A protein has these predicted regions:
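Gly/Ala-rich beta-loop-alpha elbow adjacent to hydrolase catalytic centers
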Residues: 92-96, 100
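Active-site nucleophile loop of the alpha/beta-hydrolase fold
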Residues: 115-125
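The serine-hydrolase catalytic nucleophile loop
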Residues: 27-38
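Conserved alpha/beta-hydrolase
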Residues: 41-59
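Catalytic histidine neighborhood in serine/cysteine hydrolases
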Residues: 204, 208-226
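Catalytic active-site module of serine/aspartate enzymes centered on a nucleophile-bearing elbow/loop
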Residues: 221-256
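Conserved alpha/beta-hydrolase "acid-adjacent" motif
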Residues: 196-202
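Short beta-strand/loop motif that positions the catalytic acidic residue
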Residues: 183, 189-191, 195
Length: 256
């Protein structure tokens, strides 16, 4: 694991308007979240970005990790965020978005809202159904990272994709999708028009499944899957800050 792969926290103390809990995607690490986190920090928000178990290491290490471990780490990070004493939002990319949705299903009362970037809730690729059997004869497949339109940027990911961990990811989708109706917090969704990893229809499934009264959606026309590092990154950064500002203001208005 390199220094860039490590989890990070920006604690602004009493000056912080709220706290954003950022969750990276499958086979990636917090480096894909750092520019977003730095932008939110500069906009006046605390940021906590955990490293999910098995990530930031070799694919062999990730192969031993499970979605329950990933969720447990995110939930622990939520408790860390709540301890800072400010309203807490959760934001995630791809599988990070799935985990944020699961967090909202289980602990929605502790969240002020979600910001999702190309969230994953299903895989339309037919070979995905073969993964449970495939993992015993083919432990890993080609890496899925760095789906970026920006030619000079690379995402930090494992060198290959462990099939066993992908099977666990599919299990996460299986428990999360049927309970989307439990999500009632405000949502801000950013979806790339062209994504070679997660079908953009995933965002539509999320919008249709949740029961949030406020759901705002933005299409990212110039970015592929890892949009937090791509051409439309600033749209995500500014849009999420504006969303958080609005939600915090509404909450204060209710309590004033």
């Amino acid at each position: 694991m390199t220094i860039d792969s490590e989890e990070f926290t920006f604690d602004l103390g009493s000056d912080a308007k709220a706290t954003m809990l950022l969750c990276h995607g499958f086979t990636s690490d917090p480096a894909s979240m750092r520019p977003w986190g730095e932008s939110l920090r500069d906009a006046g928000f605390n940021v906590i970005a955990p490293l999910l178990p098995g990530h930031g290491d070799t694919w062999q290490v990730l192969a031993k990790a499970t979605w329950q471990q990933w969720y447990a780490r995110l939930e622990a990070a939520l408790d860390e965020a709540l301890a800072l004493g400010r309203p807490v939002f959760a934001g995630g990319l791809s599988m990070g978005g799935t985990l944020c949705l699961r967090l909202a299903e289980q602990r929605g009362a502790d969240l002020a809202g979600l910001v999702l970037v190309n969230p994953a809730i299903f895989d339309s690729k037919p070979q995905g159904f073969l993964a449970p059997a495939l993992r015993y004869v083919m432990p890993s497949v080609a890496a899925i990272g760095s789906d970026l339109n920006k030619p000079d940027v690379r995402e930090k990911t494992t060198s290959r994709t462990p099939v066993a961990a992908y099977v666990s990811l599919r299990q996460l989708w299986k428990v999360t999708r049927p309970e989307l109706a439990r999500v009632t917090v405000p949502l801000r969704i950013f979806t790339s028009a062209e994504d070679h990893v997660v079908n953009p229809r995933n965002s539509a499934v999320v919008r249709a499944g949740v029961r949030s009264k406020s759901v705002e959606s933005t299409v990212l026309p110039r970015s592929f899957h890892v949009a937090t590092l791509d051409f439309d990154a600033e749209t995500i950064f500014s849009g999420s800050a504006e969303f958080m500002d609005r939600q915090v203001s509404r909450t204060r208005g209710v309590h004033d």
